[in-house]
A protein has these predicted regions:
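Single-residue signature of alpha-solenoid repeat helices
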Residues: 339, 396, 438, 476, ...
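Conserved catalytic core of two-metal-ion nucleotidyltransferases
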Residues: 1-22, 62-236, 243-301, 305, ...
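Active-site nucleotide-donor binding segment shared across nucleotidyl transfer reactions
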Residues: 16-49, 53, 58-59, 208
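Register position in tetratricopeptide repeats
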Residues: 389, 431, 465-469, 503, ...
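Residue-level recognition of tetratricopeptide repeat
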Residues: 328, 385, 427, 461, ...
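Canonical tetratricopeptide repeat
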Residues: 416, 424, 458, 496, ...
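Start-of-helix register in tetratricopeptide repeats
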Residues: 321, 378, 412, 420, ...
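Short coil turns that delineate tetratricopeptide repeat
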Residues: 351, 408, 450, 488, ...
Length: 759
């Protein structure tokens, strides 16, 4: 957990306690809800906490806030504090600094936050929702100057101007109250739905999707989650929500976070240089321009989409004609690998946000105005079936919904859509532990689609539940074996195979299979199940490893840790001993050097992901120290060199230099002493002093690794310096640069001698 996540967890636990004590409802939402199910805590890269709260509960929380909020905490919402610049409320730490873009010229609290997305009751009549949505967009435009909201819904610019006129001449409070009276006029007991109070996209939910709440674990805290959790996650993220996205697709949120000061101190520093009036005027003109041009821009985007659609269809037709088999034949053969290849470009275009949209800020217009590529019903059916058979059920369902809206919807497409909805019903039954109903629902689906991975995985859950209870274990084994015949590289089924081996007492074989399973799945649920099963054995494993190292059984220790590093790559103790063991058993100097390079890269990567947070990278210290020792650095000097990797403060760096000087170092190790002092000086920015120490290290007749390191330093510096000198020479006189650069080496003769020694 990052430091930011620890702070957010503290804030959330405070809010959770207040809600439970005062019978206030909320549910975990968005990525936080995924974290509850997939990680039982934060998604590793998540940097916020989202909850939903019904409007009546939020209003009650506001009423009691004066007596229940801890020190340095506040509730923010625009209907209470008109200086607040967002449409949804927040629980904020006022003694911290986390400034979002919309707060740049505001006066509201800008600390670390919990987003509380209010759920406003909405009648069943869609016209009432459209009325709410229109006024919510205008409300958002007036509250938040940074973002243009209404253009995506083509809100008339005249409507915005009418309310802007009221805002300007009748006042902010009076105008916003008029809008609030319209938007919040519906009563909870009269409405079957909620709209999420967010200008970005006011999602609609059935009330029974959210309440009554259920309870699940989040970072060892029992939290409220939506009543139909699986339905919510499927609706919001698709059927593939449990899969961990590639690194580049992981979303985070932008905020200027400054440790050690409050948001007031930051604002006092930059606000005097900002022309607030000009920013507000520019913002208003940008909104007017965007709203006025929204329809034109959407028409242009539609025309661009049509051109791309035509070229994509032509490409698809060419691919189909080049295939040795027709689409119908490939479907009958269930050759979905070949079909997926044929449809690759079609999917890239048709499934993009620009064509079918997404229920998010950027994709909402296309979501309500999708563009379908004109292909035959046979082609469309084959494409949708391929999506189902390649674990993209959510995308297939979305496409089928869009196709149905066109009015041309053949029976096989209707059947496929109905079957996907049956599958989702079975998943919902399973969530509520109605196992028999879920299994009965799946039975006809398994007959019609015997090799759909998602369906096979779901059925395997029933069989494994029974096997864990000692019922029909043979049936489970046969089914998992058949599943692995169909999907030999799927870690989901490998994990079950390992579990069955473990039940039979074949633990060593099971661990090997678990390791393969870990490497062959990005399913977060499977990863979590492996973690929960294996983590209790991690501590005993590292103890065994240490015992093996103590008695000199290094190969046995390495074999043990290589396996467990595959099993628990994120377990800190396992990772620490894996690298320590590698440093202990390396047989060649090149292996130790390679290991050091690998560790340093990991440290740099982890620092880049969590700047300023060094908790996780501490686990590499022992391995680095052992590696330096293996390369000839005495114990204390090896520790100094390791500490240098983790140190950047000026006082700490000077202390490291003193430790290197004062260490009880044997005479033959003086080269290493000067080398380490040189490294410290270089990190301090004292280049000349650093190279003086490097030259002295070379004079001490250092041999082996230290001489290799020094040679690399000198030759690299000369190579890079010569390139810079050439640049200076082209621009004019390079003599000043050459004198400064080469001065640290001495005379030309000394430089020539140094090069000979390095080579």
């Amino acid at each position: 957990m990052t430091e930011k996540q620890e702070h957010l967890l503290q804030l959330f636990r405070e809010l959770d306690e207040i809600c439970k004590k005062n019978n206030l409802r909320y549910v975990m939402a968005g990525g936080t809800a995924i974290g509850v199910v997939r990680n039982e805590g934060f998604i590793p890269w998540d940097d916020d906490v989202d909850i939903y709260m019904p409007r009546d509960d939020w209003n009650k929380l506001v009423e009691i806030s004066g007596s229940v909020l801890p020190e340095h905490r506040a509730l923010q919402c625009v209907d209470v504090d008109r200086s607040y610049t967002n449409t949804f409320p927040r629980y904020v730490a006022t003694d911290s600094c986390a400034l979002h873009k919309h707060q740049i010229i505001g006066r509201d609290s800008a600390g670390e936050i919990i987003d509380v997305l209010t759920l406003d009751p909405i009648p069943a009549d869609d016209k009432e929702y459209e009325k709410y949505r229109t006024h919510m967009m205008i409300y958002s435009e007036l509250v938040n100057m940074v973002v243009v909201y209404g253009a995506r819904w083509e809100i008339p610019v005249t409507a915005y101007l009418r309310w802007l006129f009221s805002y300007t001449f009748l006042g902010k409070d009076r105008t916003l109250k008029k809008l609030e009276k319209i938007m919040y006029s519906y009563k909870e007991e009269d409405c079957p739905r909620y709209a999420m109070r967010w200008g970005g996209c006011p999602f609609l939910f059935d009330k029974d999707m959210m309440f009554p709440v259920k309870y699940m674990n989040f970072e060892n805290t029992e939290v409220m989650v939506p009543h139909r959790m699986s339905d919510y996650l499927i609706w919001h993220y698709g059927d593939e929500w449990s899969y961990i996205p590639p690194h580049g697709e992981r979303e985070s949120h932008d905020a200027v976070t400054v440790e050690g000061i409050t948001y007031k101190e930051l604002r006092d520093d930059y606000l005097p240089g900002i022309r607030k009036g000009r920013l507000r005027r520019d913002s208003i003109w940008r909104k007017i321009y965007s709203l006025a041009g929204a329809k034109r821009n959407h028409r242009l985007q539609y025309k661009r989409n049509l051109l791309l659609a035509k070229s994509t269809v032509m490409d698809l037709e060419a691919r189909i004609s080049e295939s040795r088999h027709s689409l119908k034949e490939l479907v009958e053969k269930r050759d979905f690998s070949q079909l997926n290849e044929i449809f690759t470009k079609y999917y890239q275009v048709q499934l993009s946000s620009a064509f079918i949209g997404r229920e998010d800020f950027g994709g909402i217009y296309a979501f309500y105005h999708p563009v379908l590529l004109e292909v035959s019903d046979v082609t469309f059916y084959a494409a949708m079936l391929t999506l189902v058979y390649t674990e993209r059920i959510g995308k297939a369902w979305r496409m089928l919904v869009v196709k149905e809206q066109t009015g041309t919807f053949p029976s096989e497409l209707a059947q496929l859509k109905s079957d996907i909805e049956l599958f989702r019903r079975a998943v919902c039954d399973y969530e509520f532990k109605r196992y028999q109903e879920a299994e009965d629902t799946m039975a006809p689906l398994m007959e019609r689609y015997p090799e759909v991975p998602g369906f096979v995985k779901f059925k395997s859950r029933f069989l494994m539940e029974r096997a864990r209870n000692g019922i029909d274990m043979v049936e489970a084994e046969l089914y998992i074996d058949e599943a692995l015949r169909l999907f030999p590289e799927d870690g989901y089924f490998l994990k079950y195979q390992g579990e069955l081996l473990w039940m039979k007492g074949k633990c060593a074989d099971a661990l090997e299979v678990f390791a393969d399973a870990r490497e062959k799945t990005n399913n977060g649920i499977t990863q979590l199940e492996l973690d929960k099963f294996l983590n209790p054995y991690g501590r005993e494993t590292v103890k065994t490893c240490q015992q093996l190292l103590d008695v000199g059984q290094k190969d046995g220790a390495m074999k043990l840790m290589a396996l467990w590093y595959r099993l628990l790559p994120e377990n800190p103790s396992v990772r620490e001993y894996y690298y320590l063991t590698r440093a202990s058993v390396a047989k060649k100097r090149s292996e130790v050097e390679e290991l050091i390079g690998e560790i340093l890269k990991r440290i740099d990567a982890e620092r880049a992901e969590s700047p300023g947070e060094n908790n996780d990278i501490q686990i590499y210290k022992r391995a680095l120290t052992k590696a330096w020792e293996r390369l000839g650095y005495p114990g204390e000097l090896a520790r100094v060199r390791t500490d240098l990797v983790y140190t950047s403060e000026a006082d700490d760096l000077e202390w490291l230099a003193e430790r290197a000087k004062d260490g009880q170092i044997r005479k033959e190790k003086r080269a290493q002493v000067y080398k380490v002092i040189g490294d410290v000086r270089r990190k301090q920015g004292q280049t000349e002093a650093a190279f003086q120490n490097y030259l002295e290290a070379l004079r001490q007749n250092g041999s082996g690794f230290v001489r290799t390191e020094l040679s690399r330093i000198f030759l690299t510096d000369m190579y890079e310096g010569s390139k810079r000198a050439a640049v200076y020479a082209k621009a004019g006189d390079a003599s000043e640069f050459l004198n400064q650069w080469l001065g640290k080496y001495g005379s030309i003769e000394e430089i020539q001698q140094l090069v000979k020694e390095c080579l």
